[in-house]
Amino acid sequence: MRSLLNKIVLLLIVLLLTLSCIAGASAEDTDTPAKDLTNYLSIRQDEGHKDAYGRLKTDNLYDFVRYAAYETISLSWEKATERPAYLCIQWYTLPYHVELRQLDQNGTMLSEEPVGQTYDTVVSLSPETASVTIAPQRTGMSITRIALYSEGTLPPPFFPWKDTPHGMDYLVVATHPDDDTLFMGGIVPTYGAEQGYVGTIAYVTKPARLRVQEALLGAWEMGTVYYPLFLEFEDVFPIGLENHFLPEVVTLAFVRMLREYRPLVVVSHDLNGEYGHPQHKIVSASIVDACRLAADPTYDRSSYEQFGTWEVKKCYLHLYPENQFEMDMNKPLAAFGGRTALEVARDAFQKHRSQTGGAHYVHDETGLYPVNRLGMAYGTVDAGSDLFDNIDPTLFASYIPPESTPEPAPEQTQEPTSVPTQKPAVVPTAEPAPDPTPVPTQSSETKTGAKDILLPILYALIGAAIASVCFLLFRRRKRS
C-alpha cells in the first residue's frame, strides 16, 4: 500500500511540473520581449564610412549615414550568444530601389527581395542566415539606425504593420503629423479599431525625421494597423507656399493617391484651416477637387492609364457647416479596454512630443475646434447621419459575401389514382462530401489553442490522482 501511495505522489509531482512548464511556455510565447543583440552586429562597408559603425547603432534620428548607389554594406553576427530573429533598419528617407539579400555561412544567397516603402523595416531572418547585404541600386540610401533582435516582441517603433491596402473603406488626410490626432482623432479609433473598417492615414508633409517617427507612434496608438502614406511635400509656413505647395500640384498628387489606394470615404481638414493655417486650407480645398477629378478619365492620363478612375463616395471635412454629423467621442471602446475615442486621440497626441509643449490640444465638443464635428463637402451618395451611411456594403474592403446555399428542389407529389399504388421505397441519398479541411499553420494562435486543450486534461489527471490518494488513505484509516 505504501509503495502505491509513493507512486501516486510521484505522479502528482510529475504532473504539476509539466503543468508549470506548459504555463510558463505559454507566457513566454506571448509576453517575452525580444533581446537586443545589436552589440554583436558587425558592419562591413567602404573605407569612406569608418565612423558609421558606431553611428548606425545609436538611436539618434537626427544622424544618418548616406550611401551612394550600388554602395553595399554587409551585416553579420558571428559572436552572437543566441540566434537572431529580426534585423531592424530605420531609414532617414524612404528607401527606393534597395535590395536586401540573406546569405548562409558559405556565402550562398538564400533570398533576395526589395525593401518596401517604410521608414522602419523589420527583416525576419531565416535560421540559416549568417549575414545580410543591403544593396542600394540607382538612387542610394540613407540609414539612421540598424538593430538586431532575438525572437520575441519587438520594441517600438518596430510595430507589426500590415501593408497599405489598395482598396480602403476610409482615408484620413492630414497636412502634418499630429493633425490627424488634433482634428480627425476619432476616425481611426471608432471606425478602424472598434468597428473593423479598413483604412489608414496619409501625411501630406514630411518635416524632420523625428516628426515622421512621432506620426507612426501616434498612428499606432490610435489603432492604425495599415502602414500610413507619406506624400513628402515640404513643410512651409507661410513663406514658400508659392514655390513648394501649389494647389494644382497638391491636387495632382491627391488624384494619383486616390486612384491607387481607392478609399470609399475621405476625411480631411477644415476649409478655413482650423486656426487659419495656409497649408491646411490648401489641403482641404485640394482634396475636395481631387475627389471629383479622380473619376474623370481626361484628368492626368498617366495615373488613369496606370490605375484607372476612382469614385470616392464621400469626402468629409472638419467643421464643414453642411451635411454635418457629430461623432460620439465619449463612448467606451472595447478595442481600447474601455477608453473613449477622445481619450485615445489625446493619448495619441502625446506621442508627438515635439509638439506637446505648445497651445495645441484635442478639443472635445465644447472646444474651439471640436474633433467630433464633420460635414460632407463632396459626395456621390446622400450624407445620412454617419460616415458610411448610404454606401453599398458590398463595396467595403472588409465585406465578406455570404455563402451561397443551393435552394432545395421542390418535392414531387404523385397524382392520385383509383388503384392503390405501392408505397415507394425510400432511397437513401448520399450526403454531400465535406469541404477539405485546410491544414492549420503553426501560428501562435494554434500553439495557444493546443495548450488550452492540454491544461484541462492535466488538471483532470491531477484531480483524479488526488482523489485516489484520499480514497486509499481513507481505506487505511478504516482498516486500522
Language model features by range: what are they?
Residues 1-9:
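Bacterial N-terminal signal peptides that target proteins for export
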Residues 11-20:
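Bacterial N-terminal signal peptides
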Residues 19-29, 448-452, 473-476:
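Sec-dependent signal peptide cleavage junction
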Residues 29-68, 91-93, 104, 119-121, ...:
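The feature marks non-catalytic terminal segments
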Residues 32-86, 90-300:
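Active-site beta-strand->loop->alpha-helix modules in alpha/beta enzyme cores, enriched
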Residues 436-449:
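Juxtamembrane low-complexity tails/linkers enriched in Ser/Thr-Pro and polybasic
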Residues 459-480:
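C-terminal membrane-anchoring or membrane-association module
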